[in-house]
């Protein structure tokens, strides 16, 4: 499957975040919007229908074919959505209960297929924050299902059972409380001594929480960040 993610009107409503990237490359929960589709559709490829000036950094190619699906970039993927999009026949478009376009098989699709389940659309910057807790929990389940966490140092106080560390994640002498939300530590991330974390938290690859940090409420820290 090849997904083409369309910015549509959300390119304007998500500014300034969308100045430097396509809408589907924005992060909510643990992963970007695009990665949520890729994780649920292994082996898939993707490109973007976005501003021309982004072509130097992002693939803006527009291939055609039976395996190509056009997807609204601000749409948060679920297993049911991925299945519904994959099932579209040529000329069909997936719409929500209000008739809003979600995806299509073919750029000029006109036959509506209604997706009855509720959907999450990241239309404005505040949507990324208000939906972060819900999406982070879903991402955590997807990323950790059937897997075991890498061990964390015995110097930590770990509360709850929704703490997952990828290989190479490090935490020392800190308190991690997952009873209020999942805590996901990506590869190479680090929580320095004396930090207090009350989930939910997604700490990106190579990111750091500095000495004595206090984190609470659903928080996403992207790759390579220092807090």
Predicted regions and their residues:
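Structural signal for interior beta-strand "rungs" in well-ordered beta-sheet cores
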Residues: 151-227
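Terminal amphipathic alpha-helical/low-complexity segments used for targeting or macromolecular assembly
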Residues: 1-161, 168
């Amino acid at each position: 499957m090849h997904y083409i993610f369309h910015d549509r009107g959300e390119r304007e409503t998500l500014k300034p975040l969308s100045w430097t990237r396509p809408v589907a490359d924005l992060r909510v929960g643990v992963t970007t919007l695009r990665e949520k589709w890729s994780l649920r559709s292994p082996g898939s490829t993707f490109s973007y229908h976005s501003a021309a000036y982004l072509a130097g950094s992002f693939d803006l190619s527009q291939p055609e074919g039976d395996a190509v699906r056009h997807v609204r970039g601000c749409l948060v993927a679920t297993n049911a959505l991925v299945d519904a999009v994959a099932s579209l026949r040529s000329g069909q478009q997936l719409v929500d209960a209000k008739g809003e376009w979600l995806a299509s098989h073919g750029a000029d699709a006109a036959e509506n297929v209604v997706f009855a389940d509720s959907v999450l659309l990241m239309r404005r910057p505040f949507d990324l924050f208000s939906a972060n807790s819900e999406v982070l929990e879903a991402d955590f389940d997807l990323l950790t299902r059937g897997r075991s966490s890498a061990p964390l140092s015995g110097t930590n106080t770990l509360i709850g059972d929704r703490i997952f560390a990828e290989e190479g994640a490090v935490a020392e002498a800190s308190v991690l409380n997952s009873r209020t939300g999942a805590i996901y530590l990506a590869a190479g991330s680090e929580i320095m001594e004396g930090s207090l974390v009350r989930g939910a938290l997604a700490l990106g690859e190579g990111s750091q929480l500095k000495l004595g940090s206090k984190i609470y409420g659903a928080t996403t820290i992207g790759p390579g960040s220092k807090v």
